[in-house]
């Protein structure tokens, strides 16, 4: 309770120490994907995920081992449920790769794609967020609501669509059983 200000200061100092230790790598840590939050309530929100899926890395042309070495977090359990999210994160990976300055492991023998000495001198540590999130949906301009749009009850329609999806299996089973009884009656 009374150690709150001191704890805040300790965290600040720890963050500064970590940033110095990992310099010239970004202070924010490794690059993370943009993912949608779970559940109907929050699925419009974008947040940072744990790591990029293997499909995203493959589409961006980056090896899993190489990705971890150049500061890209990888989550092998993650699956892409939509093409849009895959494309967004692949674009994110490509943008990161283009801005990246790779220091050679051995200065005497630099590999292909490694930075030159001039580029290495210019390299500075990124202090803020690593590739800040971009808006996924572009907002529409305001316009007048038409009479047809007023007649449609959107909330009810969405609820109905969800109910149809939820009950589709039971309804199909019931229809199949009803169809089987009718066919059975004709045979007898």
From Swiss-Prot:
Cysteines joined through disulfide linkages: none
InterPro entries noted in UniProt: Ribosomal_eL13 (IPR001380), Ribosomal_eL13_CS (IPR018256)
Region annotated Disordered, chain positions: 165-188
GO cellular component: cytosolic large ribosomal subunit
Comp. bias (Basic residues): 165-174
Keywords on record: Ribonucleoprotein, Ribosomal protein
Any one of the GO BP annotations: translation
Pfam families xref list: Ribosomal_L13e (PF01294)
Domain of life, source organism: Eukaryota
Amino acid composition bias (Basic and acidic residues), ranges on this chain: 175-188
Gene3D superfamilies: 1.20.5.110
Signal peptide interval: none
Single GO MF annotation: RNA binding
Family: Belongs to the eukaryotic ribosomal protein eL13 family.
The protein's name: Large ribosomal subunit protein eL13
Gene for this chain: RPL13
